[in-house]
Curated annotation (Swiss-Prot):
It comes from Salmonella paratyphi B (strain ATCC BAA-1250 / SPB7). Catalyzes the interconversion of 2-phosphoglycerate and 3-phosphoglycerate. The keyword Manganese applies. Keywords: Glycolysis, Isomerase, Manganese, Metal-binding. Mn(2+) 2 binds at residues 14, 64, 444-445. Substrate binds at residues 125, 155-156, 187, 193, 263-266, 336. It comes from the Bacteria. The lineage of its organism: Bacteria, Pseudomonadati, Pseudomonadota, Gammaproteobacteria, Enterobacterales. Transmembrane segments: none annotated. GO terms for cellular component: cytosol. Monomer. This is 2,3-bisphosphoglycerate-independent phosphoglycerate mutase. SUPFAM superfamilies: 2,3-Bisphosphoglycerate-independent phosphoglycerate mutase, substrate-binding domain, Alkaline phosphatase-like. The gene is gpmI. Pathway: Carbohydrate degradation; glycolysis; pyruvate from D-glyceraldehyde 3-phosphate: step 3/5. Belongs to the BPG-independent phosphoglycerate mutase family.
Amino acid sequence: MSVSKKPMVLVILDGYGYREEQQDNAILNAKTPVMDALWAKRPHTLIDASGLEVGLPDRQMGNSEVGHVNLGAGRIVYQDLTRLDVEIKERTFFANPVLTNAVDQAKNAGKAVHIMGLLSAGGVHSHEDHIMAMVELAAERGAEKIYLHAFLDGRDTPPRSAEASLKKFEDKFAALGKGRVASIVGRYYAMDRDNRWDRVEKAYDLMTLAQGEFQADTAVAGLQAAYARDENDEFVKATVILAEGQADAAMEDGDTLIFMNFRADRAREITRAFVNADFDGFARKKVVNLNFVMLTEYAADIKTAVAYPPASLVNTFGEWMAKNDKTQLRISETEKYAHVTFFFNGGVEEPFAGEERILINSPKVATYDLQPEMSSAELTEKLVAAIESGKYDTIICNYPNGDMVGHTGVMEAAIKAVEALDNCIEQVTKAVESVGGQLLITADHGNAEQMRDPATGQAHTAHTNLPVPLIYVGEKNVKAVEGGKLSDIAPTMLSLMGMEIPQEMTGKPLFIVE
């Protein structure tokens, strides 16, 4: 009989930031006796989860993808956003061979260059500055037909903030004397990640067929009509932009389509609809043979050109565990499963040796304020069983509630989500202590601690750039170190496990054993 393992457990409370003001703070307005007691009695510290400390631009809010990459890598990982900002500033972007070839191919064949992406200054899935640079690249290289298909945000940005962005692009096309915004649609449709293919189909038809529920002469007019229908940016219905006398922008064989989102998880479904010959998410009314470019690699099995292939990370936490013959479990709900697997492993899809995974289905509801507890009860039951099983050296778990319910902007629901989490943490803490294991509780970024934007008075549906908590539960006598960041977590776990820290990990342990 093998010896029962005492696991090192990392619980990531997604979107659970730290803010001392109670006003509009779902975490402080919730009843959280368990987290309150842990914070009062256990070794703890605050760590940075945004900006330069996670490889993002200064003061840029953190997000789940960035957070989990840094958590697993044990070093600051410069994100695609920062990398692209530098490329554009230094103008190497304009010489990227994949992008220039795609534009030249369309231009030389008299075909259109279609550019699609999330038109947002949010910097989470994309940045409008990158899309602007792509428009400039296409124009500079002589493309005549340049069509922008704008996905609208309102989730990583205020709920009604797209007008300024659309106007900026309409002005740009006017100045260039060519190109135009061809369609607008909310990210709810174009950027689903939970196999809700009926939504994706609407965005696909909009772009391939130039058919939507609505039509407008200009993008700004289309947006204003959506607001009049009470649709915020995220939920704007498929709208064709087509003034009298204009040729429509329906996609044709031989056209180029460049997807300017850099974050993978919400880019995959619509990309597969365009690229995969055997696609079966919905019956495509029109299949177009496009020259399709992904800005970054959205998945290894999507076979199409990539402008910025991933830089590989060596000796992430998961890989280091495998090299040291340790067993590990990754567990979460659908919404954050990719984060504790693919992103935590530095963009590696395949599990490492000794790595097991458990996926709990997220509830099928339109928005998570309708079920703020999500699937946390089932997730906790499975997590507790795994802790007590004695099978795993380490377990990584993500609870999505604080983030997914925080995104709805509904304060009462976010409070319920936080209270559900407190109950879960109680069970997890008891399980860890009962087997003599160790537990770190942290977050990947903030969200639920700021539910209203003090400047606008609108619901605050985006992430924050506030610090996140880090709490230690275990038998070791440890002292907390101040000034930490997400990339210090993996080295902290290794040191608490008594393991060597690989040299690639430049993070420092945040709990020193006394």
